[in-house]
Amino acid sequence: MQTTLLKPKTIQVEQLAANKAKVTLEPFERGYGHTLGNALRRVLLSSMVGYSATEVTIAGVLHEYSSIDGVQEDVVNILLNLKGVVFKLHNRDEVTLSLRKDGEGPVLASDIQTPHDVEIINPDHVIAHLSQGGKLDMQIKVEKGRGYVPGTMRRYADEPTKSIGRIVLDASFSPVKRVSYTVESARVEQRTDLDKLLVEIETNGAITAEDAVRASAKILVEQLAVFAQLEGGELAAFDAPAPRSAQQFDPILLRPVDELELTVRSANCLKAENIYYIGDLIQRTENELLKTPNLGRKSLNEIKEVLASRGLTLGMKLESWPPAGLDKR
């Protein structure tokens, strides 16, 4: 009698629309289609990493229950429209973006000023409409996250109270909009009691349906790995990334911070925090640097300006940093 469970041998990906696809896998043992299909669906809807606007500051606005002269929408509707903008950040976890527009006409997502490593997936999305003489000036904080996080649940260790004028948004980070699955009958030779799993996925464009399935499957594997070692002990690292060599990084990241020609005070503060290379520096956030002893807002602004002149910003993320063999002085 055969005791080995069948594994899927056929995988088909059918593109239904720009951000919609159907993934078909077969054959499964009877019952496994529903078991795995339901697990994938729940993970896809709840656990995918994405990006969302989390805070907004609008010039001349103290709270969300306001209106702006020359803008057709009130602030509440502007914020609702802003939540529909799909962001994608590369090599960083957060960023603050600016939007400044005046003159009659629509305000689009493409009007948001973005650095080279921030992408707006739906640039034609309408945020507001300006009348003649209207003006809209806002700062938008975008963060990386998972699932849905209400604004009331967010905590700021560096700010015990919410500052006036800063509007905290409910953030929906998930890039997956809809998931459904069906199970049909499959046949292998004489066996007709097998399952075929069809998963239909729609995303917001920040991730493809295929990548979403891969990511959700990896999450399930990581979560289930602990059950294979019920005796106890530490689990082996899952897919630990191989260290990257220095040649795989942008050469500017390997230069010492001394080459930024900062003031002596700023340079000494960075070295006291073991920040020796530009690659070390850009991975720190503004809040982290402000906690550095003797480094104030003036020094922080100096650092930001010097980095901006080289096309860099704070809060960037570098995989496998530092490279192998980099001298930590």
From Swiss-Prot:
Keywords: DNA-directed RNA polymerase, Nucleotidyltransferase, Transcription, Transferase. Belongs to the RNA polymerase alpha chain family. GO terms for molecular function: DNA binding; DNA-directed RNA polymerase activity; protein dimerization activity. Its EC number is 2.7.7.6. Disulfide bonds: none annotated. One of its GO terms (cellular component) is cytoplasm. Residues 249-329 are annotated as: Alpha C-terminal domain (alpha-CTD). This is DNA-directed RNA polymerase subunit alpha. CDD domains: RNAP_alpha_NTD. DNA-dependent RNA polymerase catalyzes the transcription of DNA into RNA using the four ribonucleoside triphosphates as substrates. GO terms for biological process: DNA-templated transcription. The lineage of its organism: Bacteria, Pseudomonadati, Pseudomonadota, Betaproteobacteria, Burkholderiales. The N-terminal domain is essential for RNAP assembly and basal transcription, whereas the C-terminal domain is involved in interaction with transcriptional regulators and with upstream promoter elements. It catalyses: RNA(n) + a ribonucleoside 5'-triphosphate = RNA(n+1) + diphosphate. The keyword Lyase does not apply. Homodimer. The RNAP catalytic core consists of 2 alpha, 1 beta, 1 beta' and 1 omega subunit. When a sigma factor is associated with the core the holoenzyme is formed, which can initiate transcription. Pfam families: RNA_pol_A_bac (PF01000), RNA_pol_A_CTD (PF03118), RNA_pol_L (PF01193). Residues 1-231 are annotated as: Alpha N-terminal domain (alpha-NTD). The keyword Transcription applies.
